């Protein structure tokens, strides 16, 4: 079946090349502003946090798809540090491994990193991002905190009255929808703890490929959630030259796909066969990823990926607590008095909600590539079963996103032996 698919993809690539007009001049590679030493240090720390938090969430049996922006999580910790005192503040810095940095270094460094990496224009990606801190109607946010949190973290602030829970939830979800231009219509259906502060991050991210997928190389396929459960999905296909590595010992393959302007890349790691991702996740560390990437080589690869939007909401409260953020979430111990001027607030929930769109769009591709000999026998990267993916900034090495796709949207197709 896969050999037939490979042949079909190669024939389609050649046939479609004749149809494509000479491409427009591709956008010149973007120019990222040089990061300060503080921002570079915090980029490294946020990457370490990414793997720790991902591993903690991967062990949660209730979690299927994972979608995290380590940069945004780091900014949330910075916000807690900004609004906290004593152990409450120091724990937030410790989870970020930034204990030895002065408070001002943390806030200015994270603010710089957030502005640089979320600059959609420079990076030619679609990334709509909003952060809002909701406080109980009985609490007023301090002016200094409102000003500083807006300056460093672009965080908005609102009071919310949960006596009318339906109206409160509607308000949160409407804000998220407006922030993401309707791509994320719902953050949550319920809020369990309504007597504390709610930090809500709402995001929509859409990669624009350095070389787009042809819109006609799209069809309906099956995605094997497990060996016995398959859902129908739309798949998009293209053949091109990519950094690629096949680890035969660990039975996994990985591919790196540059995004437009080449300031960042999407990296996908996938087991050779359908299996739970637990084995691969145990291998995944910052050091191991670096080692794998060092072995990648430019090769012809026929890539097939699910097409569509993945929507995921995580309440990170308990997962951050597992990494050491215990005081801020404890009603009896939290000291967030820099937020409100009083010790009358704790962090009840940290909602991290993302819509991530896998689509064909990107820079025009050069049809002349399909006459090259090396594309006649490409490696096959057929993502029809669970995989891990990362969006990586090529300058700082910071991760814009880390996630896994276990169950895409789709109806059950059939049972397989």
Swiss-Prot record:
Residues where Phosphoserine is found: 140
Site (Reactive bond homolog): 376-377
Protein induction: By heat shock and retinoic acid.
A GO molecular-function annotation: unfolded protein binding
SMART domains assigned: SERPIN
Subcellular location: Endoplasmic reticulum lumen
Swiss-Prot/TrEMBL GO biological process terms: chondrocyte development involved in endochondral bone morphogenesis; collagen biosynthetic process; collagen fibril organization; protein maturation
UniProt function note: Binds specifically to collagen. Could be involved as a chaperone in the biosynthetic pathway of collagen.
Similarity annotation: Belongs to the serpin family.
Protein name: Serpin H1
High-level lineage: Eukaryota, Metazoa, Chordata, Craniata, Vertebrata
Gene assigned in the entry: Serpinh1
